[in-house]
Design a protein with these regions (language model features):
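Basic, low-complexity terminal or inter-domain segments flanking catalytic cores
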Residues: 1-136
């Protein structure tokens, strides 16, 4: 089920159904659909959304979905999305963050989102040997 086609890359964003329920998928980045809890307050660190209640014609909604998928921007040459992929290697309890674009993944600091925007940009540019990238 295609939710919308991202305008910069021309790549579709899908709503898929997996082993643990619905999730949104975009070029290797994915995000589980999360509904807010009914019996307790929302966690401010979690981006809740019900994909069936969003207006995908609205550019703010599209931006919200891309940010929920941890997309940072787009590669200047191949137009593929650049974003953060979080993976749990093996049976370890620790999660590892990677900056990803296409098939290339480069490990990045776990505190990536706490870094200043300028420092984040430097890491992305260094990871893919680029001078600039189109940010969201």
């Amino acid at each position: 089920n295609i939710l919308f086609i991202e305008k910069n890359s021309g790549i579709p964003i899908f709503l898929k159904n997996g082993r643990f329920g619905e999730y949104t998928e975009f070029d290797g980045f994915n995000k589980a659909s999360k509904l807010p809890p009914e019996d307790k307050p929302k966690n401010p660190k979690v981006s809740y959304y019900n994909p069936h209640e969003l207006d995908y014609e609205n550019s703010d909604t599209k931006l919200f979905v891309l940010r929920s998928l941890r997309i940072l921007g787009f590669h200047p040459e191949n137009k593929r999305p650049i974003g953060i992929k979080i993976r749990k290697p093996g049976k370890a309890f620790k999660f590892v963050k990677f900056i990803k674009c296409g098939d290339v993944e480069v490990e990045c600091p776990n505190d990536f989102y706490k870094l200043e925007e300028e420092e984040q940009d430097k890491l992305v540019k260094k990871a893919f040997s680029i001078d600039q990238f189109q940010k969201l």
